[in-house]
């Protein structure tokens, strides 16, 4: 009986791992997912200060050719962020129906207006608020920060 149970569990594990390997995001979706992670996810960060925004925007390569005017960093575990993709679909700003909403801890970084590329300056605002992200793929992963 114990051997059968062990074999059944091993078979279930093998099938699960195979299934996960078969449903990886496409190359394009994976690139968009990696870009989303680079631009918007900082699970370890506390954020909230102007210096945080100045450093992170430069570190994440959003200030080299021009100063990105606005960006949001999400301070949640990636699995919490990915779980937003499991919520009901809502319209995105562009009209597509692949957006989802959730409440997360964020730091919004807004460019001050007196910035120049390579020396961009930001004002920070930390909050817990509703965000909307676009998700794609099977399984769905976040690919765009909508609002």
UniProtKB/Swiss-Prot annotation:
Chain positions recorded as dUMP binding sites: 35, 40, 68, 71-72, 145
Protein known as: Ribonuclease 4
EC number: 3.1.27.-
GO BP of this protein: antibacterial humoral response; cellular response to starvation; defense response to Gram-positive bacterium
Stretches of the chain forming a coiled coil according to its record: none
Pyrrolidone carboxylic acid modified-residue sites: 29
Protein's cellular compartments: Secreted
GO CC entries: extracellular region; extracellular space
Disulphide bridges, residue numbers: 53-109, 67-120, 85-135, 92-99
Residues spanning the signal sequence: 1-28
Key words of the record: Antibiotic, Antimicrobial, Disulfide bond, Endonuclease, Hydrolase, Nuclease, Pyrrolidone carboxylic acid, Secreted, Signal
Family, as annotated: Belongs to the pancreatic ribonuclease family.
Gene responsible for this protein: Rnase4
Catalytic machinery residues: 40, 144
Entry-linked PROSITE patterns: RNASE_PANCREATIC (PS00127)
GO molecular function, one term: RNA nuclease activity
Annotated source species: Rattus norvegicus
Main location: secreted
The keyword Disulfide bond is annotated on this UniProt entry: yes
Matches recorded under Gene3D superfamilies: Ribonuclease A-like domain
SMART domains per record: RNAse_Pc
Pfam families per record: RnaseA
InterPro entries assigned to the protein according to its UniProt record, in alphabetical order: RNaseA, RNaseA-like_dom_sf, RNaseA_AS, RNaseA_domain
Role, per record: Cleaves preferentially after uridine bases. Has antimicrobial activity against uropathogenic E.coli (UPEC). Probably contributes to urinary tract sterility.
């Amino acid at each position: 009986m114990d051997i059968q149970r062990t074999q059944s569990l091993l078979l279930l594990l093998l099938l699960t791992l195979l299934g996960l390997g078969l449903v990886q995001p496409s190359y394009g979706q994976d690139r968009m997912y990696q870009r989303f992670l680079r631009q918007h996810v900082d699970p370890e960060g506390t954020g909230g200060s102007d210096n945080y925004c100045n450093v992170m925007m430069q570190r994440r390569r959003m200030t080299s050719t021009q100063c990105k005017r606005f960006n949001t960093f999400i301070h949640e575990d990636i699995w919490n962020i990915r779980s937003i993709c499991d919520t009901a679909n809502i319209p995105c700003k562009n009209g597509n129906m692949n957006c989802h909403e959730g409440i997360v801890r964020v730091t919004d970084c807004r460019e001050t207006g007196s910035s120049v590329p390579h020396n961009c300056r930001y004002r920070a605002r930390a909050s817990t608020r509703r965000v909307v992200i676009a998700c794609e793929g099977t399984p769905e992963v976040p690919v765009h920060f909508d609002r």
